[in-house]
Amino acid sequence: MMKKLIFSLTFLFILSFAHAQNMHLSFNKLLNNYVSPEGKVNYAGLKKNKHTLDAYIDMLAKTKVMENWGKSEKLSFWINTYNALTIRTIVEHFPVKSIKDIDGGDPWKVKRFTNGGKALSLNDIENNILRPMGDSRIHFAINCAAASCPPIANKAFDAENVDALLEKRTTHFINDAYFNMISHDRAKISKIFDWYKSDFPNLDAFLTKYNTQHTIVDSKTAISYFDYDWKLND
């Protein structure tokens, strides 16, 4: 009896994991087709294929985030959900010059997604689901459709690639001089580090770790921030 129970639970876990892996395939194809390697988004093309994006988001809405999912499954699910919703927000209003031209300048507060009986905004997903998971690298994976936002990856996150892809996106962002310019004496960095200070309690060590020149950032480094460009990332 116990062996049957263990087998059944194992089988259900495998099915759940397989579903979590495969659910993002259609989004992965959309990103492959409509996002450049540099993170520029072809919203006009996506608008013509909106039915595929809608079907993906509908599937996400109907998917129960299981307690037995690991952190990697949950992270990839919610990162993809955030990015898909952001893309659809732009597509529904395209052509538009900036995401801040939508919903009175604050589209992040609009409840545009329902999962598990809860209506969620982009702010809810970011601040109440993703940030509490304790991985500050999510800030370089979720995309706000703006020029100064960390470029969106042209592939979907999944349980197998999420850690490596978070690492890659973070490293790419930190070392792109459009977003961050780092030397020992002074560092001019993205406004993201100012807005989300609490997620980077040891910012000096974070910047030192991820800049590929291995420049030491410490208490002697003068920190300033780039202005944020809200122009559309197309």
Predicted regions: what is each one?
Residues 22-234:
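Interaction/scaffold regions that mediate signaling and macromolecular assembly across diverse proteins
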Residues 18-20:
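Cysteine-nucleophile amide-bond enzymes
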Residues 5-16:
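Sec-dependent N-terminal signal peptides
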Residues 1-2:
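N-terminal secretory signal peptides that target proteins for export/translocation
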